[in-house]
A protein has these predicted regions:
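Bacterial N-terminal signal peptides
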Residues: 10-20
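Beta-lactamase-like hydrolase cores
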Residues: 23-75
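Active-site SXXK
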Residues: 63, 75-105, 269
Length: 304
C-alpha cells in the first residue's frame, strides 16, 4: 500500500471513530454540577419507593428533553381525561354548538363511575358538554368522563383521535372506573411518558387544537383541584401549573402538566408511577420529588 493510501486509510479511521464518539456522546445523559446524571437521580428515587417510575419532560424554550423509562408502558388512569377532553374540543371546532349541548344521565350512571363529585349533583337537570369537560379535568369527575366518552363513541374513538395526532402508544379500552385497575403487564389503558408528553404538548401548546379551544384547555388544566401535592408541590413558588392527575390500583400515582415559569417558555412534564402490590398506597411525594429533579436540571442547563 502506498504512503498516500495509508494516509487516506488513517484519515478514514480517525473520522469514523470521531463520528462514532460524537454520536454516542450526543445521546449521553446530561450531567449535573454534582457529577450525577439525572437518570441516576431518577433511579435512586425509584429504588427508594419500591415502584416503577416513568418520566418525560420537555423544555419548550430550547427543546431540551429529559426522560426515564420514557418508552415503557404505564397505566394512564385519569390522566387520559386530557385526551378525552382534547377530542371533545377538537370536535367543537367544526360544531361550535357542541359545547352547549345538554346531556342527561341517571343516578346509576354516576354511582357506577366510582367518583362523581360534580356530575352527581346534576342528575335532574343534566350538564352541558362544556361543564362536563371542566368537571372531568378540574375535578377528575369519572361520571363526567363517561358521558363524554359515550358522546364521542367510546374509548376506541379517543384512541383514534390520539392516532390522528401521531400518537401510536395511547391505548384507551375501558371506561371509568375499570380503566384504573393498573394491573402490571396489562396493556389496556396505557401509554408511554414520551407519547403522553408529546400529545399534551400538541394539545396545550401546539397546533392540535385551534387557539380558542387550546386556551380553554389550558384554563381547565390550571383550575385543577386534585394536584396540589404532586407536580405543583415540586415547582418553585410563583410558577403556574396546569395539570391532570391520575390514581389507580397498585399504588399508581400519575400527573401530567404544563408548567409556566415566570418570563420563560413552558415546560411539559409527565410523571407516571406504579407499584407491584395491588393494595399499595398512592405516593404523591414521588411525583413532587421527580418534578424537583426535572426543574433543577432545566434550571442548571439554562445557566450554562
Amino acid at each position: 500500500m502506498s504512503a498516500w493510501n495509508k494516509l487516506k486509510l488513517l484519515i478514514l479511521i480517525s473520522t469514523t471513530v470521531s463520528l462514532a464518539f460524537a454520536a454516542s456522546n450526543s445521546s449521553m445523559p446530561l450531567i449535573s454540577e454534582s457529577g450525577t446524571t439525572y437518570q441516576t437521580k431518577f433511579a435512586q428515587l425509584e429504588s427508594s419507593v419500591n415502584g416503577r417510575l416513568g418520566i418525560m419532560a420537555i423544555n419548550t424554550a430550547n427543546n431540551q428533553q429529559l426522560e426515564y423509562r420514557g418508552n415503557e408502558l404505564f397505566p394512564f388512569c385519569s390522566t387520559g381525561k386530557v385526551m378525552v377532553v382534547g377530542a371533545i374540543l377538537k370536535a367543537s371546532e367544526s360544531n361550535p354548538q357542541l359545547m352547549l349541548r345538554q346531556l342527561h344521565y341517571s343516578k346509576q350512571d354516576t354511582e357506577s363511575s366510582g367518583y362523581a363529585p360534580i356530575s352527581g349533583q346534576h342528575i335532574k337537570d343534566g350538564m352541558s358538554v362544556s361543564a362536563l369537560s371542566q368537571a372531568a379535568i378540574a375535578y377528575s369527575d369519572n361520571g363526567a368522563m363517561n358521558q363524554l366518552l359515550q358522546l364521542l363513541g367510546g374509548p376506541q374513538a379517543v384512541t383514534s383521535y390520539a392516532r390522528s395526532m401521531g400518537d401510536d402508544k395511547f391505548n384507551f379500552v375501558r371506561t371509568e372506573p375499570q380503566l384504573n385497575t393498573a394491573i402490571p403487564g396489562d396493556e389496556r389503558d396505557t401509554t408511554t411518558p414520551v407519547a403522553m408528553a408529546l400529545s399534551l404538548q400538541k394539545l396545550s401548546l401546539g397546533t392540535a387544537l385551534d387557539k380558542k379551544q387550546q386556551t380553554q384547555l389550558q384554563e381547565w388544566l390550571k383550575a385543577n383541584t386534585t394536584g396540589d401535592k404532586r407536580i405543583r408541590a415540586g415547582v418553585p413558588k410563583g410558577w403556574i401549573v396546569g395539570d391532570k392527575t391520575g390514581t389507580g390500583s397498585y399504588g399508581t400515582t400519575n400527573d401530567v402538566a404544563v408548567i409556566w415559569p415566570p418570563q420563560a417558555k413552558p415546560i411539559v412534564l409527565v410523571v407516571y408511577f406504579t407499584q407491584n402490590k395491588k393494595d399499595a398506597k398512592p405516593n404523591d411525594q414521588v411525583i413532587a420529588q421527580a418534578t424537583k429533579i426535572v426543574i433543577d436540571e432545566f434550571t442548571t442547563a439554562s445557566k450554562k
